[in-house]
């Protein structure tokens, strides 16, 4: 049954790729690691809001180092460091529930929606979206207006706030590192799938 074998091979490949991605998120070379729950929430919400999982993971790593209970000096809370007033607005706009922001099941969907909102607002410009995530939409809108930044702005050094410069730079760097490592894991999953199917075919007897 060639069709059935082909379909089984595809399902097995997809399963292996997903499994490798989860393992990669959990075990990548870093001083910080997400919990299994956070790793799963990254994948679910990246798919839900059409974000690269590497981008969502990079934002969480830079914002909180995966510390679900983190509270900053300005009152930003949880894995994605959401200010409660902003989180309430996000909940109202997105339809996601508002609750304990130290709960990643509440925090990450809100933060992921907001990240997608900012990417759309700035017409896909990741530098501007990340700058707004860190410094606020009002500041970024002011900079765009006063400094005549173009839609394809990418001069991170021109961002007035050093903290925001650092945030944007780190997120983009970590995202690219994660993407490269994920591609390696994906290739290994495909190779394992081919090897597994070949092994199965060898041991299949034709009656």
Role assignments for model-derived ranges:
Residues 24-198, 207:
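Catalytic glycan-binding domains that act on GlcNAc-containing polysaccharides
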């Amino acid at each position: 049954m060639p069709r059935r074998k082909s379909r089984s091979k595809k399902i097995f490949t997809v399963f292996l790729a997903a499994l490798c991605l989860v393992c990669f998120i959990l075990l990548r070379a870093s001083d910080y690691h997400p919990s299994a729950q956070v790793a799963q929430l990254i994948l679910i919400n990246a798919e839900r809001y059409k974000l690269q999982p590497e981008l969502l993971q990079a934002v969480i790593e830079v914002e909180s180092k995966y510390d679900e209970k983190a509270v900053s000096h300005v009152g930003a809370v949880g894995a994605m460091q959401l200010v409660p007033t902003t989180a309430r607005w996000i909940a109202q706009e997105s339809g996601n529930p508002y609750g304990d922001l130290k709960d990643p099941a509440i925090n990450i969907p809100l933060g992921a929606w907001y990240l997608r909102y900012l990417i759309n607002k700035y017409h896909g410009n990741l530098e501007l979206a990340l700058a707004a995530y860190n410094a606020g939409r009002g500041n970024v809108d002011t900079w765009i207006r006063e400094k005549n930044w173009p839609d394809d702005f990418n001069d991170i050094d021109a961002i007035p706030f050093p903290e925001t410069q650092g945030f944007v730079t780190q997120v983009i760097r970590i995202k690219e590192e994660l993407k490269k490592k994920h591609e390696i894991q994906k290739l290994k999953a495909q190779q394992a799938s081919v090897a597994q199917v070949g092994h199965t075919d060898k041991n299949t007897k034709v009656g």
